[in-house]
Structure formats: structure tokens, C-alpha cells
UniProtKB/Swiss-Prot annotation:
Positions annotated to bind Mg(2+) 1: 300, 313
Coiled coil (UniProt feature): none
UniProt protein name: D-alanine--D-alanine ligase A
Organism: Brucella suis biovar 1 (strain 1330)
Positions of the ATP-grasp domain: 141-346
Amino acid sequence: MASGKMRIVVLFGGRSAEHDVSVLSATNVMNALDPAKYEAVPVFVTRAGQWLLSRFVNGALEKPSSGAELCLVPGGCGRAIVVPDAGAPYEADKIDIIFPVLHGLHGEDGAVQGLAQVARVPLAGCGIPGSANALDKDIAKRLVNEAGLSTAKSVTITREEVPAFSALEQALGLPIFIKPARQGSSVGVHKVVTEADYQAAMSDGFTYDDKLLAEEFIQAREVECGVLEDEGGALFVSRAGEIVPAESHCFYSYDAKYIDADGTEIKVPAELPEQVENEIRAIATRAFRVLGCDSMARVDFFVTADRRIVLNEINTIPGFTDMSMYSKVMAVSGVSYPEIINRLVAHGLARGS
């Protein structure tokens, strides 16, 4: 911190199918970083996995196709080498903390978190175990079910073990939802009613992951809340928010989330009885701990008409786009966007020390 400001590397882009969502999220993070407090260094992770120095100009992040690469030094405690297109490599100014805004595989699955640990540089956000456990929906379900938490019934599908459509229909009923086990943002998710739907869903799903989940349909409201851990380990759980997909979308799809501006109505806070909301927040805390999460997560639920609460998913790097729920439920709970950033940084520094 030679300048008196904390040097924070913001990673965005990435190799996953959620690359474009990451760019939107990181743009908002860059806007929220206090320039009087932080020296923000945006680093674009290409679809091939290169870390290229970027710039934030007029509210937009540059996405270079080539240029200077940033390489962390193993055990370097924040040291990094810049490899330019031309000329000799040189040592960059010391990095104080890494802030990954990478969604999905190779960013939210423990990979970048492990790299930061190898380099001995602090990292904002969830650590290795929670990231890996939460991103894999199959493993996450097994862990929270073992802890006694309710989830949708599901069948795990691999390339080697593909059940017949009739078997899934018998086990789960119709419709069925097919989803990649290790993707987010509803990428590769399909609503299946017929054998033809099933074959199409399998073909598409396996382009995103080698493991899929077939899940039962639950007629319910979709409710989410945010968890934020302070530097001392205390958890703050936000009010709940509700997602209501437009009638033009049969479920909360990628298009409803990010493409169609009218695809979703978000109600913050959700209109829920106090007892139900308190139970949702308690389950969110329990699931967060069971999966080994720390720092931050968004926890998603189904709430049925008879007030049964079903845990859906946990996202350890939730979306930070204009339409994303995490910052909205935190704001209505009294935590502003810049304060989220400050708390994540403080937590990462405390854990790194």
C-alpha cells in the first residue's frame, strides 16, 4: 500500500459459461469500490484462462484479447510478475487482496481460491471447501441432506449412467428439471415433459458438465436471502427476497435473469409471515455452515403453499448485476453495496493473516 490505498485485484470474465455475467457483475463491483480507499486493478480472465491486465474506463471494463499477463508468485505474499506482449517481464506493485468476481467453474469452485492460497495472497469471498462443495449441486445436496435439511428429490446422471426417461418419470414425476451439476445462472437448465425434451436436455447439459441432476418440480415461490460474514466470524443474514418469473418464461431461466428486462419481477423484501422468514434465515445459516462456507453466499429456497421450506442452492459468488438479488436483499437489510465490498475485504484480510 505504497500509495496509502489498498491494492485490490478484481478478477472477471473466466472460462465458464457464465463469462458474460461475470463482466456485468464486475462492472458493478468496480463502480462500488471507493477510489479514496482502494486502488482497483481489473484483470480480465479470458475464455482460455489467461489473466490480462484490463482498464476501467468511463464505467466500462475493457476485455482485451491480448496484452500484458499477470502471474502470481507462489508463496510470494502478494508478489506478481507482469509479462508484456513485448519487452522483459517485470515485477508489479504488491497485491494486497484478490477479489474474484468469477461465476461457475474455474472461479467459484475452489480453483482460484486455491491459487490465492498457494500464492499466499488474501482473497475476498468464500474459501476452498465451501466454494467446491456449494458449486457441485450433487455434493451439496448430499451434505445438507445428511444434516437433515430438505431439498428437492433428484437423481444424479453421468455419461456412464444415464437413466431411462421412464425411470425418472416414475421416481420424480413430471415435469422434471435437468441441470448441469456445476453451473449457475440457470445455464443449461431444461424443463422436461417428454422423451424428446429429455434427449435434448441431456445433449445440451453434457456440453456444460460431465454430471447432471434430474430434479423434481416443486410448485412453490422462489425465495432467496444473503449471508455475509464479518472479520470476526459472525454471520449477518439478510431479509428474504422473492423472484417471480414473467408468464412468458416457464421458469427462472438465463434469459429471464439477464436478457429479458421484463423477464422477472423481484420483490424485496418478500411478503412472508415473520415466522417463515425467520426459519428461512435459520436454514440459510445452517446450510452455510454445513457446506463449509465462509465470507459470503446467496441461499435459494422454494416455499410451498403450505409453508414447507425446501433448500434449492447456495451460490458463493452471487451475481452482482443490476438485476441480481444479493445486493438488493442486503440493501433492504441496511447493508449498502460499498459496505458489502468493505466487509468482504476485511474478512479476506483477517482470514489471510
